């Protein structure tokens, strides 16, 4: 049995700042239109980004639509402070970032036309997962669109195999740096050991080990060595979401 107790703080190791085109409100609005909805106009849209990190995913939209208003929330005070400095330096006036637990999100923050929750759902407890769906139910405006991503089963089982190997190999080490270095050694061992093997399983392990070796250290720490990373079957997520009055855009 693997002891999954790696608590790697996002304050200690900030997540790398990425932008994700599939969470961009114009893209989400287009999807809604294709499904026969009448999503709110982008020019004056109110955006909520749950687990925003340093908030870079909000900046392009805010610059393009200066009359819009965006709020990004994240538990990591370090990431929020980094993001606030970026926003201040760029002189962007219509984005707010706040260090806040998802559990503390409520109606006092207002309602939103587009809510994005990318890279959060699989990495939090069941309590927080339920709260995310509650937030969408209470804070999403009529005809608004929400985006949630998560690691989907059964496909995630393949990556989780390597994740568990990395966690087992590194669990006796105390610091994030040591865990990461040991995991890199494991990946090299996997790659070297399977160099001449041509079985489908060996091919997968070898190629996945090579791929993980190219990722940023901070990404590997949170994705493969973090305390929680739980895959979800699509039907399980749909069953939970259907308990709320959502129309699912599949």
Curated annotation (Swiss-Prot):
InterPro entries: CFA/CMAS, Methyltranfer_dom, SAM-dependent_MTases_sf
Gene3D superfamilies named in the record: Vaccinia Virus protein VP39
CDD domains in the record: AdoMet_MTases
Pfam families: Methyltransf_31
Domain of life: Bacteria
Name of this protein: Uncharacterized protein RP028
Organism from which the protein derives: Rickettsia prowazekii (strain Madrid E)
Classification lineage: Bacteria, Pseudomonadati, Pseudomonadota, Alphaproteobacteria, Rickettsiales
């Amino acid at each position: 049995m693997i002891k999954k107790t790696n608590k790697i703080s996002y304050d200690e190791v900030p997540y790398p700042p990425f932008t994700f085109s599939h969470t961009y409100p114009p893209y989400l609005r287009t999807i809604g239109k294709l499904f026969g909805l009448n999503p709110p106009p982008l020019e004056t849209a109110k955006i909520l980004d749950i687990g925003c990190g340093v908030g870079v995913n909000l900046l392009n939209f805010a610059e393009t639509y200066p009359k819009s208003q965006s709020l990004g929330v994240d538990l990591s005070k370090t990431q929020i402070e980094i993001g606030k400095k970026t926003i201040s330096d760029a002189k962007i006036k219509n984005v707010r970032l706040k260090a806040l637990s998802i559990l503390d999100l409520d109606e006092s923050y207002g309602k939103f036309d587009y809510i994005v929750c990318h890279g959060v759902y699989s990495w939090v407890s069941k309590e927080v997962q339920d709260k995310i769906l509650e937030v969408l139910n209470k804070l999403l405006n009529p005809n608004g669109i929400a985006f949630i991503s998560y690691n989907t089963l059964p496909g995630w089982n393949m990556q989780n195999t390597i994740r568990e190997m990395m966690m087992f190999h590194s669990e006796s080490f105390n610091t994030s740096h040591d865990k990461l270095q040991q995991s890199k050694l494991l990946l090299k061992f996997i790659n070297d050991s399977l160099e001449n093997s041509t079985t489908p399983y060996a091919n997968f392990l070898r190629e996945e080990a090579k791929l993980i070796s190219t990722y940023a250290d901070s990404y590997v720490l949170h994705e493969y060595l973090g305390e929680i990373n739980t895959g979800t079957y699509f039907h399980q997520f749909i069953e939970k979401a259907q308990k709320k009055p959502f129309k699912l855009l599949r």
